[in-house]
Swiss-Prot record:
InterPro entries registered for this protein in UniProt: DNA-dir_DNA_pol_B (IPR006172), DNA-dir_DNA_pol_B_CS (IPR017964), DNA-dir_DNA_pol_B_exonuc (IPR006133), DNA-dir_DNA_pol_B_multi_dom (IPR006134), DNA/RNA_pol_sf (IPR043502), DNA_pol_B_thumb (IPR042087), DNA_pol_palm_dom_sf (IPR023211), DNA_pol_type-B (IPR050240)
Biological role: Replicates viral genomic DNA. The replication complex is composed of six viral proteins: the DNA polymerase, processivity factor, primase, primase-associated factor, helicase, and ssDNA-binding protein. Additionally, the polymerase contains an intrinsic ribonuclease H (RNase H) activity that specifically degrades RNA/DNA heteroduplexes or duplex DNA substrates in the 5' to 3' direction. Therefore, it can catalyze the excision of the RNA primers that initiate the synthesis of Okazaki fragments at a replication fork during viral DNA replication.
Record family assignment: Belongs to the DNA polymerase type-B family.
Record carries keyword Lipid metabolism: no
Organism: Varicella-zoster virus (strain Dumas)
UniProt EC number: 2.7.7.7, 3.1.26.4
Keyword Transferase attached: yes
Catalytic function, reaction form: DNA(n) + a 2'-deoxyribonucleoside 5'-triphosphate = DNA(n+1) + diphosphate; Endonucleolytic cleavage to 5'-phosphomonoester
An annotated GO BP: viral DNA genome replication
Name this polypeptide is given: DNA polymerase catalytic subunit
GO cellular component, one term: host cell nucleus
Subcellular location: Host nucleus
PROSITE patterns assigned: DNA_POLYMERASE_B (PS00116)
UniProt-listed SUPFAM superfamilies: DNA/RNA polymerases, Ribonuclease H-like
Length: 1194
């Protein structure tokens, strides 16, 4: 690496031309028309004192704070480079050619292009200047909304296309407005609307409101006039209810979203508004057939030959290569082109360090001394999936290990560029300048929404007072913001919205695509990529950072490695393809598809279809006035409605549902263990198919029988739901809008899937993501109607869907029992199975479980091979006999063995040998290895040992009352041996403590916990008390449970004082010192402390925990009674007697003889060995002979 020159620490040197004023605040900077920084003469200086290599070690604690009077700079390859001076050679790649007020494109630059791709859409508000007489000024006088399409031309230019003339509009019932306001025409309504705006509080107080933005709106509201609005009278129908008649509505066109939003809230709030919350972007996409939110467009002359206008650099809103102004008639969408231009991906990761008295504390962005010390940035080409640049931003000098640099070179990767900075602000302003100058279209990382972006934004806002509104695509007044940032690290989802920069967090993708006990990056990389990372514990970072450039290079390697793993995850799962397909299908922006949930996807689609058929959508819908007990709050049960082999989940946050629906439970499962074949029939796309088959919709529903009694009985269906009779007309009377959407989407999905086999590998991936996106949207339709506070709730429809689903399951059960219970009728229906009959006498068929969309059918007396062969025929016969298309049953799987535990919880072996589990976690991250290992052993024995399986099936048929006088089936001996072995291991004096370590995540600071008497918090406080290494937020704290001793009790008292919750004294029955009552969490201890101090583990706790864990899983064998299961499993434990050796010796010395006691060596005082054969004999005698009473366990 080149030798650095001029590496400046202002606290050690006074370089020429640089004036340093400690703690004098920020220098004043010149304000430009853009808010991103292009020049700075001074800035706040924050840097760790550990970088001061020329001062004594004892003086290197803490952080330098002050103001540095010079422009920010960066050191790269030994050279000093100004960060903000665009004329200087840049240490990072640039894609912009305009910076500040200077245009670097050159005279030969040709702005022309014809076709362009759109990836993001931004709404801005514009007010025309007085001298402008263009058609674009007319559209923004006094105020207008402009839609900006951001993307790239076919020829590679980054473009921004500003679309004028897009008006929001809303509807309001004419008769109601005329009555309320005493008017009769649209012109009179325009006058009232303008008066409402001019008299608004914003207008009256614009001089005192916070900031220019409100003042601007106040000025524009003052200038509102009747001419600002266009009002039409039009006939439309409310989408709610079949008996709603068409009537006259005022359609009010407003040039500004600010006008529309204010009027919908404040102009006669008691009057219902329709579609007032539909934004201008949605109107642009919906009112122009074929327009897409993500895809290709081409430019064309307008209806009257009007042409587009190229903006000069001085008027550009962004730093795009070209900006043009146009109207919507200058645009034409290009269908069936799924190609992507050369969009760029920024993959980044930050490393932080606390600079306070405790360097191991978790960094807080609001603390001035907690610093970002490194940022790794990997820059990719998305369509080529190639890594193009590697950058490492480092606070202080940094030398990457030569080994690592050579490894990257050997792998054919770009050589990392190391950028070094004197202060944190220079590092952060350089990173933000890279974001602005390189202008990547997409960004990713691991937990960047909750941590990396949040930390950077908070630090720049609260510590450095740097506005970020100009660092997205928009140069000033843009969006660069995070909502709902959670303080509990990984536990909460937030939203990040940056104009022109789509953030896809791979942590969110990993939690939806993978089912793991831990979602740390290392765990995800092992599972998804079969790679592991070189871990660097957070506790080591302060020491590495303070030790010089070589060890800082180790941190840099770690930082780059994390970004590289995330980049590989991105191109493995390709979330951008699936989400862009969702955005295109739902006609919403990509950012909305990621962060705004399911509701908006269905709403926009329904809006377009409703509009084409003369319906309008009321804001907020209408509340349902009934209770439906079978409709249970839930969010997650509709994902299973389509083919299981295509497990695709929507990305991003949930839809914000506070009320949802779960498939109605029809009958409780017949719990137990089955060794007869159990076939599972599933309804394909249950809820979408019910909506289609029964024509359910807002528009086909009526609550009034008088409305339908004039129709033929075959023209409507009646359902009783929650005590109300609901009527839905058939499709020949009025077609369901929801049904039409589903029919079109499913037909589209089928066509796309048919194209996949004949496509190239790249095209097949894209098509697969498209069909998956359709599946996601289809599965959202049912939930859309069932959210009470949603966009357009209709609980009647949602409740009817679950009612029909319940009836379908009941009718399926009755059909099976009525038609196939008799062996002769079963053979008649399935003559091919006669050769697979094992015993005609033993033949029996029974539906043992039915829930949501599945029916579990047990067959006795027929081989599993035979049942597996007729499964599809069985499904077809039932579907044809009972249901109308598109409802159909499919044979999903056939179990060879099945442990049916409770509703939605089972474990089984399906035909073919694969183990399938639902709702059961054999290996839980909160359990120790000992418990997980034995729980797994017990399940594997149950499923794979035929002797144990038969015995378990026998046991599951025994009633609860019989077990007090009944022995275990002899075949359960193997089960007992495993439990006895577990007991032997845990009572052995040579325990491996590592097998008993449990962990729990410190999800927030201890002070933020309501209940602090938790095991991992106990260990946290003990480490504080012993001045050990303190865990940080998001770290998992290991602990074990120890036996209660005087030392443990003393520690518990100290911990109670530390957490501010002293243990209460409870006086005993006798006089003397009061005893403190300890709970399990008080017995938690640091494993290292246990090992070093020879503390004993709490054997009773661990074995009880194992028995408890096993009982939850195996209670289905014993009548689903957990307590009974625990008692029965304890029968397998060898009975032991605790012998008081001192007392035994005293009694023997007094002449007493020990009878039935173990053999003891009085000299060694140790228990003699019992042979394994004798021990097994004792176990079997105890378990399989009927005891007179439940044996006492010590």
């Amino acid at each position: 690496m080149a030798i650095r020159t001029g590496f400046c620490n202002p606290f050690l040197t006074q370089a020429s031309g640089i004036k340093y004023n400690p703690r004098t605040g920020r220098g004043s900077n010149r304000e430009f028309l853009h808010s991103y920084k292009t020049t700075m003469s001074s800035f706040q200086f924050l840097a760790p004192k550990c970088l001061d290599e020329d001062v004594p070690m004892e003086e290197r604690k803490g952080v330098h704070v002050g103001t540095l009077s010079r422009p920010p700079k960066v050191y790269c390859n030994g050279k000093e480079v100004p960060i903000l001076d665009f004329r200087c050679s840049s240490p990072w790649p640039r894609r912009v050619n305009i910076w500040g007020e200077i245009d670097f494109r050159g005279d030969k630059f040709d702005p022309r292009f014809n076709t362009f791709h759109v990836y993001d859409i931004v709404e801005t508000t514009e007010a025309a200047s007085n001298g402008d007489v263009s058609r674009f000024a007319t559209a923004t006088r006094p105020l207008g909304t402009v839609i900006t399409l951001l993307g790239m031309s076919r020829c590679g230019k980054r473009v921004a296309v500003h679309v004028y003339g897009i008006c929001q509009y809303f509807y309001i019932n004419k008769a109601e407005v005329d009555t309320a306001c005493g008017i009769r025409s649209g012109s009179e309504l325009s006058v009232l609307l303008a008066e409402c705006l001019r008299s608004s509080m914003i207008t009256q107080n614009d001089a005192t409101l916070n900031g220019d933005k409100n003042a601007f709106h106040g000025t524009s509201f003052k200038s509102a006039s009747p001419e600002s609005f266009r009002v039409e009278v039009i006939e439309r129908t409310d989408v709610y209810y079949y008996d709603t008649q068409p009537c006259a509505f005022y359609r009010v066109y407003s040039p500004s979203s600010k006008f529309t939003n204010y009027l919908c809230d404040n102009f006669h709030p008691e009057l219902k508004k329709y579609e007032g919350r539909v934004d201008a972007t949605t109107r642009f996409l919906m009112d122009n057939p074929g327009f897409v939110s993500f895809g290709w467009y081409q430019l064309k002359p307008g209806v009257d030959g009007e042409r587009v206008r190229v903006r000069p650099a001085s008027r550009q809103l962004t730093l795009s290569d070209v900006e043009i102004d146009c109207m919507s008639d200058n645009l034409q969408a290009i269908p069936n082109d799924d190609s992507w231009p050369d969009y760029k991906l920024l993959c980044f990761d930050i490393e932080c360090k606390s600079g306070g008295s405790n360097e191991l504390a978790f960094p807080d962005a609001t603390h001035l001394e907690d610093l970002v010390i490194q940022i790794s940035c990997l820059l990719y080409s998305i369509p080529r999936q190639s890594l193009e640049h590697i950058l490492l931003f480092s606070l202080g000098s940094c030398d990457l290990p030569q080994r690592y640099v050579q490894e990257m070179k050997d792998a054919g990767l770009p050589e990392p560029t190391v950028l070094e900075f004197d202060s944190e602000f220079e590092l952060l302003i350089a990173f933000m300048t890279l974001v602005k100058q390189y202008a990547p279209e997409f960004a990713t990382g691991y937990n960047i929404v909750n941590f990396d972006w949040a930390f950077i934004m908070e630090k720049l806002n609260s510590i450095y007072s740097l506005k970020l509104d100009g660092y997205g695509s928009i140069n000033r007044g843009g969006l660069f913001k995070i909502w709902d940032v959670g303080k509990s690290g990984f536990q909460r989802r937030s939203k990040v919205k940056i104009n022109g920069l789509i953030s896809l967090d791979m942590y969110a993708i990993a939690t939806e695509k993978l089912k793991l006990s831990s979602y740390k990056l290392d765990s995800v990389a092992r599972e998804a990529l079969n790679e592991s990372k070189r871990d660097l514990p957070y506790k080591d970072i302060p020491g590495y950072y303070a030790s010089g450039p070589n060890t800082r290079g180790i941190i840099g390697e770690y930082c780059i490695q994390d970004s590289a793993l995330v980049g590989k995850l991105f191109f493995k799962y390709l979330p951008h393809l699936e989400l862009s397909a969702v955005a295109r299908l739902a006609r919403i922006t990509l950012t909305k598809a990621i962060y705004d949930g399911q509701q908006v996807r269905i709403y926009t689609c329904l809006l377009g279809l409703a509009s084409s058929r003369g319906f309008i959508l009321p804001d907020g819908g209408y509340p349902a006035t009934f209770e439906y007990k079978d409709v249970i709050p839930d969010v997650g049960d509709v994902e299973e409605e389509m083919d299981e082999d295509e497990s695709v989940s929507p990305t991003g946050t949930s839809s914000g549902r506070n009320v949802g629906y779960k498939g109605a439970r029809v009958f409780d499962p017949d719990t137990g263990f089955y060794i007869d074949p159990v076939v599972v029939l599933d309804f394909a796309s249950l809820y979408p198919s019910i909506i289609q088959a029964h024509n359910l919709c807002f528009t086909t529903l009526t609550l009034n029988f008088e409305t339908v009694k004039r129709l033929n009985p075959s023209d409507y269906a009646t359902f009783t739901v929650g005590g109300k009779r609901l009527f839905f007309v058939r499709s020949n009377v009025r077609e369901s809008l929801l049904g039409v959407l589903l029919k079109d989407w499913l037909a589209m999905r089928k066509a796309i899937r048919a194209r996949i086999p004949g496509s190239s590998s790249d095209e097949a991936v894209l098509l697969d993501k498209q069909q998956a996106a359709i599946k996601v949207v289809c599965n959202s339709v049912y939930g859309f109607t069932g959210v009470a506070q949603g966009f357009l709730p209709c609980l009647y429809v949602a409740a009817t869907v679950t009612t029909i689903g319940r009836q379908m399951l009941l009718s399926t059960r009755d059909y099976i029992h009525n038609n196939w219970a008799a062996f002769e009728r079963f053979i008649t229906a399935f003559p091919d199975i006669e050769s697979s009959v094992l015993s005609q006498k033993a033949y029996e068929v029974k539906v043992i479980y039915g829930d949501t969309d599945s029916v579990f059918i047990r067959f006795k007396g027929v081989s599993v091979e035979g049942i597996a062969k007729i499964g599809e025929k069985m499904a077809h016969i039932i579907s044809t006999a009972l249901f109308c298309p598109p409802i159909k049953l499919e044979c999903e799987k056939t179990f060879i063995k099945l442990l049916l535990i409770t509703k939605k919880k089972y474990i089984g072996v399906i035909y073919g040998g694969k183990v399938l589990m639902k709702g059961v976690d054999l290996v839980r991250k909160n359990n120790c290895q000992f418990i997980n290992d034995y729980a797994r052993k017990l399940v594997e024995l149950l499923l794979y040992d035929d002797t144990v399986s038969r015995a378990a099936a026998e046991a599951s048929c025994v009633s609860i009352a019989e077990w007090n006088r009944r022995a275990m089936p002899s075949g359960m001996a193997g089960f007992g041996r495993i439990i006895a072995d577990a007991h032997r291991q845990i009572t052995s004096p040579k325990l491996d403590i590592n097998k008993f370590v449990m962990t729990a995540e410190l999800s927030r600071p201890p002070s933020a916990y309501i209940n602090r008497r938790l095991a991992h918090l106990t260990v946290y406080y003990k480490l504080v008390m012993r001045q050990g290494q303190i865990p940080n937020v998001r770290e998992r704290i290991p602990y074990v449970i120890v036996a209660p001793t005087d030392e443990v009790e003393a520690d518990a008292k100290s911990v109670a004082l530390l957490r501010g919750d002293p243990l209460q004294n409870t006086a005993g029955k006798r006089c003397g010192e009061a005893k403190r009552k300890l709970i399990i969490s008080d017995l938690a201890e640091d494993p290292i402390h246990v090992t070093s101090h020879g503390l004993s583990l709490n054997i009773d706790y661990y074995f009880s925990h194992l028995i408890g864990t096993a009982s939850v899983t195996f209670k289905a064998l014993f009548g689903n009674d957990t307590k009974l299961t625990e008692r029965l499993l304890k029968r397998f434990i060898p009975e032991t007697r605790v012998v008081n050796v001192k007392m035994l010796n005293r009694l023997q010395a007094a002449g007493f003889v020990c009878i039935h006691a173990p053999c003891w060596d009085n000299k060694m005082n140790t228990e003699a060995e019992i042979t394994e054969e004798e021990q097994s004999h004792q176990i079997m005698r105890r378990v399989f002979c009927i005891p007179k009473a439940i044996l006492h366990q010590s």
